[in-house]
């Protein structure tokens, strides 16, 4: 898996300062996509060492966001972050309509689902097909459970429905 570039944003994940890693070789090729440069298999290999380097060189972030990527490998990287960087949140943008079965949601704090459909708009449009989920983790009797809560409306302008 490779990435083209990174950016630090304040808007991709609510209330977070996120290091967003733009993963290439996107399989979805959504019409009207704002990042068609991510369709090709180009860029820098995203190894665990490279991920550590990116995190360490972006002090002050509160979240790492993977913008695309293979579910199996994203899950491995998310698990690594969860174990090594206490308190750092993890998000993933996935163009599929469901969370893949290979994903352990316990490794994530945010997951965005849904391919981009130009006529429905992005997360900031109340008519969007895309959904942003916050993963709520609870530990009871030593067992962690994780559930999803739809927080898509946090992206809408106040009063929109």
Question: What is each PLM-predicted segment?
Answer:
Residues 1-22, 35-40, 154-161:
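N-terminal [4Fe-4S]-dependent radical SAM core
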Residues 18, 63-65, 89-91, 110:
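Structural preference for beta-strand elements that scaffold enzyme active sites
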Residues 20-33, 70:
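Cysteine-centered iron-sulfur cluster-binding motifs in ferredoxin-type domains/subunits
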Residues 29-38, 59-61:
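Short, basic/glycine-rich phosphate-binding loops at helix/coil junctions
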Residues 38, 69, 115-116:
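Flexible loop residues that form catalytic
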Residues 40-53, 71-106:
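Canonical radical SAM enzyme core domain
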Residues 60-80, 124-130, 137:
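Conserved glycine-rich "GG(E/T)P / GGGxP" loop and the immediately following alpha-helix
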Residues 105-161:
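Classical nucleotidyltransferase
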């Amino acid at each position: 898996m490779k990435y083209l570039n990174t950016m630090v944003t304040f808007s991709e994940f609510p209330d977070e300062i996120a290091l967003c890693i733009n993963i290439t070789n996107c399989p979805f090729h959504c019409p009207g996509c704002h990042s068609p440069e991510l369709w090709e298999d180009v860029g820098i290999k995203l190894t665990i060492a490279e991920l550590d380097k990116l995190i360490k060189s972006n002090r002050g972030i509160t979240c790492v966001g993977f913008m695309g990527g293979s579910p199996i490998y994203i899950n491995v990287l998310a698990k690594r972050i969860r174990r090594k960087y206490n308190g750092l949140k993890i998000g993933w943008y996935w163009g599929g309509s469901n969370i893949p079965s290979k994903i352990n949601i316990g490794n994530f704090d945010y997951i965005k689902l849904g391919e981009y459909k130009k006529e429905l708009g992005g997360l900031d449009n109340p008519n969007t097909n895309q959904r942003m989920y916050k993963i709520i983790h609870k530990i009871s009797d030593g067992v962690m459970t994780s559930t999803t809560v739809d927080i898509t409306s946090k992206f809408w302008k106040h009063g929109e429905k």
